[in-house]
Amino acid sequence: MANYIVGDIQGCFDELQQLLKQAEFNSQLDTLWFAGDLVARGPKSLETLRFVYQLGDAARVVLGNHDLHLLSVALGHHSAKRRDQTQAVLDAPDAAPLLDWLRQQPLLAEHQEFVLCHAGISPQWDLATARQAAQEVESVLRSPEWSTLIEQMYSDQPDAWHPTLQGIDRLRYIVNAFTRMRFCFPDGRLDMQCKLPPKEVTDGSLLPWFQLPQRIALEKTVIFGHWAALEGYVSETVIGLDTGCVWGGTLTMLRWEDKHYFSQAALPA
């Protein structure tokens, strides 16, 4: 019984299948954790959703920003992004159950030794606060009010956490921290613009969220995806698994028990 954690798939279904063959994944015995962004720019978002859906309890999924955007497109709130290849999902005869299942996935998933989220955990949160914050958004996404949240979540503000935040401002910060965050300012505020590799940010005004000196220490390893420019980042406290398969890089999967990494290069289109 092993736990496998895989980075952003973004519709790169064939690469995922190759990884699972490498690892000899057994859905009857093992658990497969997904770091979000099941869908978007790759060619097989529909096949990916169907596969993860049918895994049932063998799959643990957290929502990514592209997953949330697909829900927004399905609701008619926004248009698909230029490079997205998600129309097949919207046109599928099983679109309704797939999207209903997707919106009920969490922002944060926990193992005894690690936590999984798409972008990271706000440096201003301890683990108890992160759990509570995730549950607040998850409860709305699973309620009749979910469409309103999806419509109103698109903003870079507020960029700082405070326990007194209320309403859509509070929910928007939580969504941004879990699904969009990369860099923070030294005072802990989120920066939603810069997508560069950290080594290319030289003026000291921005730091990766996991390198802020005042970041609250967590008692579990944080595993995340989202940030392909990190090219897979590993430290004592965080593990980044997005290695840019959809951009021609690789799809990366970690077997937690022995910390073995599996890698599959992007296949020709």
UniProtKB/Swiss-Prot annotation:
Catalytic activity, per the record?
Answer: P(1),P(4)-bis(5'-adenosyl) tetraphosphate + H2O = 2 ADP + 2 H(+)
> Which CDD domains is this protein grouped with?
MPP_ApaH
Q: By its UniProt entry, which SUPFAM superfamilies does this protein fall under?
A: Metallo-dependent phosphatases
Gene3D superfamilies of this UniProt entry?
3.60.21.10
Q: Which gene encodes it?
A: apaH
Q: What is this protein called?
A: Bis(5'-nucleosyl)-tetraphosphatase, symmetrical
Q: Which GO terms describe its biological process?
A: RNA decapping
The EC code for this enzyme is 3.6.1.41
Which family does the UniProt entry place this protein in?
Belongs to the Ap4A hydrolase family.
Q: Name one Pfam family in it.
A: Metallophos
**Record function comment:** Hydrolyzes diadenosine 5',5'''-P1,P4-tetraphosphate to yield ADP.
For whether the record's keyword set contains Hydrolase, the answer is: yes
Q: Quote a single Gene Ontology cellular component term.
A: cytoplasm
Source domain of life = Bacteria
- Keywords from the named record: Hydrolase
The scientific name of the source species is Vibrio cholerae serotype O1 (strain ATCC 39315 / El Tor Inaba N16961)
